[in-house]
Amino acid sequence: MKEIKSGKRTRFSFGRVQAPIPVPNLVEIQTKSYQDFLENGILKVLKKFSPITSSKSDLRKEKGFSLEFVSVRVGEPQNTVQECKERLLTYTVPVYTTVRITDNSTNEMIEEEAFLGYLPYMTPRTTFIINGAERVVVNQLVRSPGIYFVEEPRKTSGTRPIYVAHFLPVRGAWLEILLNLNDEVFYARIDRKRRVNLFLLLKALGYSDDLKLLSLFPQWIDVDDEYTLMHSEGLVVLEDVKTKSGELIAKRGDVITQGLIEKLANSEIEKIKVAHRYAVNTLEKLKHTYGDDVEENRAYIEIFRKLRPGELPRINAAKIFLNNLYFNEERFELSEVGRFKMNNRLEEAYRKYLIDVEGKSPEEVEGVKYTETSNVLTPMDIVLASRNLIEIDKHPGTMDTKDHLGNKRVRTVGELIRIEFERAFSKAVFMIQEKLATYTSLDKISVQSLINVRSIIATINSFFATNPLSQFMDQTNPLAELTHKRRLTAVGPGGLKRERARFEVRDVHHSHYGRMCPIETPEGANIGLITSLSVYSTIDKYGFLITPYVKVVKGKVTDEIVYLTADEEENYKIAPSTTPVDEEGNIIPENVTVRYEEKVLYVSKYDVQFLDVAPNQIVSVSTSLIPFLEHDDANRALMGSNMQRQGVPLIETEAPRVGTGMEWEAAKYSGTLVLAKHDGIVKKVDANKIIIHRIDENGKEMYDSMGNPVLDTYELLKFTRTNQDTCINQRPIVNVGEVVKKDDPIADGPATDMGELALGKNVLVAFVPWEGYNFEDAILISEELLEKETYTSVHIEVYETTARDTRLGPEEITPDIPNVSKEKLRNLDEDGIIRIGAYVQETDILVGKVTPKSESDTTPEEKIIRSVFGEKGKEVKDSSLRVPHGIEGRVIAVHVFDKEKDGDLGPGVNKLIRVYVAIRKPLEVGDKLAGRHGNKGVVSKILPKEDMPFLPDGTPVQVVLSPLGVPSRMNVGQILETSLGWLAMLTNKWFATPVFDGAKEKDILPELYKARKKLGLEVGDDENNPTGKVTLRDGRTGLEFDHPILVGYMYVMKLIHIARDKIHARSTGPYSLIHQQPLGGKAQFGGQRFGEMEVWALEAYGAAHTLNEMLTVKSDDIMGRNEVYKAIMKGKNIPDPGLPESFKVLVRELRGIALDVRVYDSEGNEIDIEKL
């Protein structure tokens, strides 16, 4: 066991593997990507459209103007992050570009800086503030552009496969080359529409000579092989065939006949070069369809005819059409990534091409790379892809799998915003062009008026506000925040559709190892589509996920760290990080298990090429916080990972006694801690700020040139609301005079303790059934947890109201509210706004507001009052902001925004008032508790502590769990955690047990027995075979339970699913406008839906009157429910119900589809149902 520093705490770690590199910056992908967009991305987009000329036609080029973008400058944010949150603003920076305009006729030029617009700016916590709300842009996993060799799904069984080479661009038409083995012919499918003969396309691309075409697909026939020779009839000879004596048997271009086969069989010739059967068949089919005289122009016209039937084929139009599809950079873009992937994939085919077609030797082509740089397709790409299809026919195992991570790339924040910016700017380019054309001289041009800033800003803003990849940040706790920033999603624009995603896409793939977590993913419809990055994973310049490995040479581990993509990793044998290694770095065992491709092999240590860097390399941050993960079933580990993100920050935080060593890393990069920016000495600490005097490398205090001390001031956040209504409160954890190093924690945030993540509490648990109160995952808890406020959390709700201009005059914020008692107004100030510190309950007034009433219904008496008292006598309606049902708490802040002082608040709004109420939520029956192993349950009873089972020394346990929750769930990690937690408490230590490299049973139980023996708690356990169990006594009777019981300390969290927030009841409330039925849901103060199954239940009982009431007066019979109310008030019998509104709606809908529906009474008179 070794000591490790974790935040400001020391832990004892059971880990045996020392990772050669530290955990990387966990949010670096976001920051780097956005920074790259600002520094390079914007300019790249502008350069892409440069130069913009005033006229498209080449004739006037020398006369017009051309505009190009020289550089980009990013300004400073105008408001602070906190101001933007309070005033519901967007945190942005201004972007400027230097524009150069040249007069083409005189070559005169002007340079001027123009404003491009405001761009949302990333905060230091890698979030964006959009209209006051913190949002995160999630990384998207999409198919990489390039080339894929796949098999088309077979339509009927018994047919032979169709192999496809699929060119996938970033932008533009698809091209698919097909090898149909049913008729052994090559085809090209153009733009997912029509299939044409491949040779027709190749002829259009310049391969017009038939023999030249066939010689692209050569094959050697062994004359000694009788079977092959007999089956070569009909093939075309590609080289003159001569005997050793020089006699010419067959010329280049001859077709092999039966006679030639006999001649060849009787000669001494060993091999002949012929065209491949598939190529010959393709050419024959082409001739059969189009005749013998297909040259380049004819090929263009035939392709055009096929793709545009009905249009008159002209040669120029046909050429332009095909060139625009695949060979024009404006219409077709492979991108740098696509070209890189394609060159890599076709490298082997290119070498084979050089040997077969160009006659080079294997030695000459060894190591030769395919180095095409064009951003569009080339004829060579198409030839190599077609030739490779023949190889795929021979070796189907070399086909590509779509689900391999080597074929997927990550679109990061910067790239997603760049795509939007490019889209916005492409629209602006046309306007710039049009405006340029209107100017006649250079000195009259106003650069700023050329660029339409509005359309650019609008597109960017709509991306942040409406794109599914820009998400409202999950801020429940620091881990939720960190995980959200590291999320990968396969859905969204340009990605998969949730409904259409196959099982294979969602499944774990061997290429995910070390790149994507195989455990952390949602449980619902999104399972496998939304995932999380692994701890050490990062992204290369092309957007492919890479993960680090340690290089191994001849059985010895080196210091070299190599990052590999999923494609590169396929070629190496990689051993796990837990492989035993001696002090010199030599691998100890002679044979080692390694991963190679998708197999696990057992090889000599000298064959090992790489070693994993850490045992937790495979999992995400959330999952690597689960101790004893290796003892949990993956399904439960998934729940554990997801539920940690739902833990509510508690009033008093407590780090887990049994951690994994990742608690500090998770808290550090979550952005909720305050970290020291430089080395220094703490000079001042209070609840709101910390001041640190900087020191140099020698520990001396630093002063500036004026002799003033160089101070760093850290402002702390106090009781700030998060997106999920939890509370952010930062507390100092340093003292005056303390020396701090750079990146040391100096203040704790929500759910952190001494710099470590602290989502729950260490509580004493016992696994024993107790009177059925812990049946089916229910949890029995002790009153002690309430007395100590163990699971009490603070939540902050915000309520707002506006004073607007109405038709009848402005609304007024005032304490003078009609028909409200003084008692109700006692906490309002002179403006009618609640005072800070007031304790409020449901229906209390937070902001007094009155709205002018309509003049039409004034009585003569009111008119007299009006004429006497003027405006004061005006009738007003109470429209005050009140506390909603089920809420009680303390007002902690009030923000008032005035139109005159704070600028525009929106159309017609004069005042905006926001009231923040802090609500204390102790643990109650119905709240959800969970451990870190997917062991979740609901509190069923709170028992007095004297009734709880107790230990031999009289200590009552705090939580009683059902032992039946463990065996079937197979999350045994919780049992080991419980025992190690007890050992930690007894010895007052903090342990770290890293995932896949943690403590073993033999490390825990003997030590636990010794610690218990010292305190007399060993009753019920055996020294020779310790189990960690203890004899418990029932708190009510004092009698021992029949068997020893497992007891210990488990880390338990309170989740955001709080019963108090969900409980709801309605007697009377709002109704839906159309059907006049009660609304649904707590937010609308709605009722419970009485659905068809409930109707069946009442029908089964024969409760006719109850059923009638349910479907009419209690639902949507408007007149009926009013009559019932009157009858109840007057004490009369309840009248018969009328016609439900839903029936009227049905009749109206039938009339809407032109069906004339009428209603008649028993005597045949028509009834107007609107009056019923």
UniProtKB/Swiss-Prot annotation:
Gene Ontology biological-process annotations: DNA-templated transcription
Gene Ontology MF term list: DNA binding; DNA-directed RNA polymerase activity; ribonucleoside binding
Main enzyme class: transferase
This protein's UniProt keywords: DNA-directed RNA polymerase, Nucleotidyltransferase, Transcription, Transferase
Pfam families the record matches: RNA_pol_Rpb2_1, RNA_pol_Rpb2_2, RNA_pol_Rpb2_3, RNA_pol_Rpb2_45, RNA_pol_Rpb2_6, RNA_pol_Rpb2_7
Catalysed transformations (reactions): RNA(n) + a ribonucleoside 5'-triphosphate = RNA(n+1) + diphosphate
Entry's EC annotation: 2.7.7.6
Matches recorded under InterPro entries: DNA-dir_RNA_pol_bsu_ext_1_sf (IPR042107), DNA-dir_RNA_pol_bsu_external_1 (IPR019462), DNA-dir_RNA_pol_su2 (IPR015712), DNA-dir_RNAP_su2_dom (IPR007120), DNA-dir_RNAP_su2_hyb_sf (IPR037033), RNA_pol_bsu_bac (IPR010243), RNA_pol_bsu_CS (IPR007121), RNA_pol_bsu_protrusion (IPR007644)
Top-level taxonomic group: Bacteria
A Gene Ontology cellular-component term: DNA-directed RNA polymerase complex
CDD domains, sorted: RNA_pol_B_RPB2
UniProt cross-references to PROSITE patterns, sorted A to Z: RNA_POL_BETA
Family the UniProt entry places it in: Belongs to the RNA polymerase beta chain family.
Role according to the record: DNA-dependent RNA polymerase catalyzes the transcription of DNA into RNA using the four ribonucleoside triphosphates as substrates.
HAMAP family referenced in this protein's UniProt entry, alphabetically: RNApol_bact_RpoB
Complex and partners: The RNAP catalytic core consists of 2 alpha, 1 beta, 1 beta' and 1 omega subunit. When a sigma factor is associated with the core the holoenzyme is formed, which can initiate transcription.
Name of the protein described by the UniProt record: DNA-directed RNA polymerase subunit beta
Originating species: Thermosipho africanus (strain TCF52B)
Lineage: Bacteria, Thermotogati, Thermotogota, Thermotogae, Thermotogales
